[in-house]
Amino acid sequence: MVLPTCPMAEFALPRHSAVMERLRRRIELCRRHHSTCEARYEAVSPERLELERQHTFALHQRCIQAKAKRAGKHRQPPAATAPAPAAPAPRLDAADGPEHGRPATHLHDTVKRNLDSATSPQNGDQQNGYGDLFPGHKKTRREAPLGVAISSNGLPPASPLGQSDKPSGADALQSSGKHSLGLDSLNKKRLADSSLHLNGGSNPSESFPLSLNKELKQEPVEDLPCMITGTVGSISQSNLMPDLNLNEQEWKELIEELNRSVPDEDMKDLFNEDFEEKKDPESSGSATQTPLAQDINIKTEFSPAAFEQEQLGSPQVRAGSAGQTFLGPSSAPVSTDSPSLGGSQTLFHTSGQPRADNPSPNLMPASAQAQNAQRALAGVVLPSQGPGGASELSSAHQLQQIAAKQKREQMLQNPQQATPAPAPGQMSTWQQTGPSHSSLDVPYPMEKPASPSSYKQDFTNSKLLMMPSVNKSSPRPGGPYLQPSHVNLLSHQPPSNLNQNSANNQGSVLDYGNTKPLSHYKADCGQGSPGSGQSKPALMAYLPQQLSHISHEQNSLFLMKPKPGNMPFRSLVPPGQEQNPSSVPVQAQATSVGTQPPAVSVASSHNSSPYLSSQQQAAVMKQHQLLLDQQKQREQQQKHLQQQQFLQRQQHLLAEQEKQQFQRHLTRPPPQYQDPTQGSFPQQVGQFTGSSAAVPGMNTLGPSNSSCPRVFPQAGNLMPMGPGHASVSSLPTNSGQQDRGVAQFPGSQNMPQSSLYGMASGITQIVAQPPPQATNGHAHIPRQTNVGQNTSVSAAYGQNSLGSSGLSQQHNKGTLNPGLTKPPVPRVSPAMGGQNSSWQHQGMPNLSGQTPGNSNVSPFTAASSFHMQQQAHLKMSSPQFSQAVPNRPMAPMSSAAAVGSLLPPVSAQQRTSAPAPAPPPTAPQQGLPGLSPAGPELGAFSQSPASQMGGRAGLHCTQAYPVRTAGQELPFAYSGQPGGSGLSSVAGHTDLIDSLLKNRTSEEWMSDLDDLLGSQ
């Protein structure tokens, strides 16, 4: 022992030392590599830092240059742009006049000289990098100074409208060097800059967002909203001002120009209202206390909310969020809203309020309109409100509150609106909620542009409803936020309710749907109950599919197209509900529909007191919903009745067929009875019957009935084609075996099966009849029948399940028919080639149906039913298959069934690939070209299912299995139940299966099962 140990140790030591040496060398290499990399990094770092500095400087220069150019353009061209807005033109001219034009021009020239001197060398670097892109955008935006450049908002129409509506403010600001003021005022006085942005919407947004973007990019620490907030805040003053290279005097001059161009009161009103309201949601309105506080708070708040939104690149957010306060939000809602309204008097608050005011004048009395007009003037005033102190905020708010109160009282006299507007705190809180929901509403604003006309009508009313309340306290954040959302809801609901209830419904709908309900609605989109009380049924049905933003569109669809829109969605909902109780869900929905109006009230209460307070709106919505619900219920009931009738017929047929099958089994000669294919197949049929029963249940689910009928006719087509194909595809061997097995089958089993399958698809019965026509032909026909039946059943099921997915629908459209019609027969017949013919007769028909599925989803349909069959059948009837067919192929089937879950993806691939292989064979056999050597292919098939990638047959099989998986997935579509319930249905039909199995001794069954399992 010692001797060997020593040598072992000796050998071990060298080995150990060698390993250690290698490790040491490797470590040394790593160290060298690390040191080399570090050295290179250090060597390159200075260059990298220099490049960063250059880029930063270039960006800075670009920002300054762009700012100066904007200031120059807005100061010089404003005369041209100002004329468009009649009111602003004089002010613009005055602002640009000797008083302001000279200082502005001087500042512009000075800044530009500095920029040119500093930037001209930098331009190359900038062009190479950020600067080039930025200058291009800024240049383009600058070229569209008025609103066309709405820049970040991308809502040029809004800003031009806003400018035209409140051009005096917007254009005046722009003309007064809006852009220069934009950054300058943003830096020194966010209020002024924000007012510019609010007013100009586009240009201020350009100058502010672009310059800020540049600025922010200059300062990577805070590139994003954080930077915006910080930069926009006091930091922005210190950072942006130095970056702009403008001294205090220049800043003062620029701000003075702004103040001169825009009345102080207007500036005060604008900033007080806009920013204050922004703060109300965000900073609790603390900003309005002092001009400086306002400047700082508004800066931080204004730039953070609005600018963040812009930089976030979420025009939706801008539109939806209180953040609209700035450019992005205000112009986004304004562009969507103001275009529809024809004037977003002030892109920001004015856009929200004046639009509300503008729409409201329709409903509001002259006094309210007068106040609205004041607000419209405030459009100018609001733009220029910024400079004003807190004292004017109170006056502006008072005016807003008065207008809002009058609007609320006069427009709808809805407590709802009065409730939100009366409490600025509430509005601020609600606005806060709004901003939080604004992200949710963002999609809505996006949709809002989709239906501007409806917005215009509805939006006007909605603003009347929504904005009046919003107007009062912090109308701008909440108002714009609600407005976009409300516009969506309004545009959707008004179409349904039109403007009849638009005043009531829109307000309530807007408050209800756009506020928390929408957010809740999105969160609960599946449930859709909290926020979908209005169109809850339709939305509930629809939301699972389309969710929040679509929910608005669907609201429009539901409201506008209650029957078509709601019905389909309702039908969708019932299918989901139908999964459990097919007919009950409709009633449940009907109940829910009936309850939905209460839901609306509840939701309204849940959402906001204003919405609850508008009982009229709730009542109108309830009535409308009730009508829609009733229609939907009727349609659903009809569908359910049809489905139930169809199911009853199928069940009746199945029962009769089962009886016939049992009788035939009993009456058949012992040899045939003992014949494994025949014996197993009838059992399979029985099992399939259970499966078909399950499938009928699936058919009962939702639209599957309609799709099933389609499938059946298709099956009928398949059947007729099947016979032809059967004759063509029938192989001599198949004909012999098929004659033996199938003929018996057709006589006793195929016809019953056909009837069974026919129960699933009335066609199979017909096919069952044709089978007698020719041994081979009907053998094939039974197969086809099975295929058609399985296909039909599967198709029905698949359409049920897949119908929702649209694949089965495509099949329903006819792809299923051609695929199933041609391939299934050939596939079936080839599969029929052996005793497998019986097995394939059932299994392959499914496969054939599934294989056609290769061309289309039909395999899913067939497979889905087949999968259910196979899981249930293969376990139960697979032994039968094993008897009827070599256990090995059958086992593959069952194994495929087991593997099915794995195969489905493969099957999808194979599905695509299989069709290609299939076509090469004769058309009849295309489906089963590989399968046509049913026995051999089946062997391969049995293997291929296991391999998932087996031969063509395997592919078909996999397809079939994926179909089963599809069945499992299909339940997801309509019958989340079908896959499970289908299997359960099969299990539920275990009695039937057992009764079929009873024909055989338990020992035989167990042996078959063992064989099947063993083969697996």
Curated annotation (Swiss-Prot):
The modification Phosphoserine is found at residues 45, 120, 303, 314, 360, 1015. GO terms for cellular component: MAML1-RBP-Jkappa- ICN1 complex; nuclear speck; nucleoplasm; nucleus. The modification N6-acetyllysine is found at residue 822. One of its GO terms (biological process) is atrioventricular node cell development. Residues 116-129, 283-292, 322-353, 392-403, 427-439, 451-463, 577-595, 602-617, 834-885 have a biased composition (Polar residues). Widely expressed with highest levels in heart, pancreas, peripheral blood leukocytes and spleen. Interacts (via N-terminus) with NOTCH1, NOTCH2, NOTCH3 and NOTCH4 (via ankyrin repeat region). Interacts (via N-terminus) with p53 (via DNA-binding region). Forms a DNA-binding complex with Notch proteins and RBPSUH/RBP-J kappa/CBF1. Also binds CREBBP/CBP and CDK8. Forms a complex with PRAG1, NOTCH1 and MAML1, in a MAML1-dependent manner. PANTHER family: MASTERMIND-LIKE, MASTERMIND-LIKE PROTEIN 1. The C-terminal region is required for transcriptional activation. This is Mastermind-like protein 1.
